[in-house]
Amino acid sequence: MSTASAFAINAPSFVNASSLKKSSSSARSGVLSARFTCNSSSSSSSATPPSLIRNEPVFAAPAPIITPNWTEDGNESYEEAIDALKKMLIEKGELEPVAAARIDQITAQAAAPDTKAPFDPVERIKSGFVKFKTEKFVTNPVLYDELAKGQSPKFMVFACSDSRVCPSHVLDFQPGEAFVVRNVANMVPPFDKTKYSGVGAAVEYAVLHLKVQEIFVIGHSRCGGIKGLMTFPDEGPHSTDFIEDWVKVCLPAKSKVVAEHNGTHLDDQCVLCEKEAVNVSLGNLLTYPFVRDGLRNNTLALKGGHYDFVNGTFELWALDFGLSSPTSV
């Protein structure tokens, strides 16, 4: 018998929520049975590069009313800009109101302090590391001395590459606590030695070498990868080199949502698919032999989650499994 339970988390307290629908299946002796039934579908990406939406500029800038004789480097001084406008007034007196307004604008810009410095990516990285080192690394020598000897994380986490949903930030993981894999739409493909080796290697390393105790697959609100899955055509040529082929890992989730909620608005379908795709990935994890062994030996557990950064909520559900009884024929 295979069951799954769910509970919602509205920080800071945990609140019981409706359990996920229970289902059962029978299998031969020694075969895992779980509530998630998943298939995989993939399509080879076309070698043709994606075409542009338009082959013309989005807009054309209108010709300026006043075109002073600016220098090419654009580094005119305040005095040079004013002199150019005064010269324009002498030549074209009818432009006096426009020129006067422009002079006022230049004067105001010259007087205002430049409070917004241009973004410096190198400086951002440097300042970020200095802050980390002074506030965390130096103040916690015991932790970092232990990490220098090796890692023994309890969690393996599959999360989306979306910049808004870093699991270490959202779940307050400390260094050494979670082995994290991030990709588009937090997907786990089925076991396959011929492709998706990056994910396969991560699962193998986490389970067999790091001996993680929990594998979490965490989806999130407003996921662009899931919206792509819901809107890309299932068949036909691809418009992307990699994205469409990748998100079809969870095509069974789309099929289920469309079949059960065909008349629902796309945004609501996407929310449903964000969670159902997690279930598909949990099912795909069962195709990895070393994951099944960990489940049989009670050394490993699988859980799914969904982070809603719009409302500040987190849902967590567990995958329970069982071995079927021997059957004589």
From Swiss-Prot:
Keyword terms, alphabetized: Cytoplasm, Lyase, Zinc
Keyword check for Zinc: yes
Assembly description: Homohexamer.
Biological function: Reversible hydration of carbon dioxide.
Source organism: Flaveria pringlei
Protein name: Carbonic anhydrase
Span list, region Chloroplast transit peptide-like: 1-108
Intracellular or extracellular location(s): Cytoplasm
InterPro entries: Beta_CA_cladeB, Carbonic_anhydrase, Carbonic_anhydrase_CS, Carbonic_anhydrase_sf
Similarity remark: Belongs to the beta-class carbonic anhydrase family.
GO BP term, pick one: carbon utilization
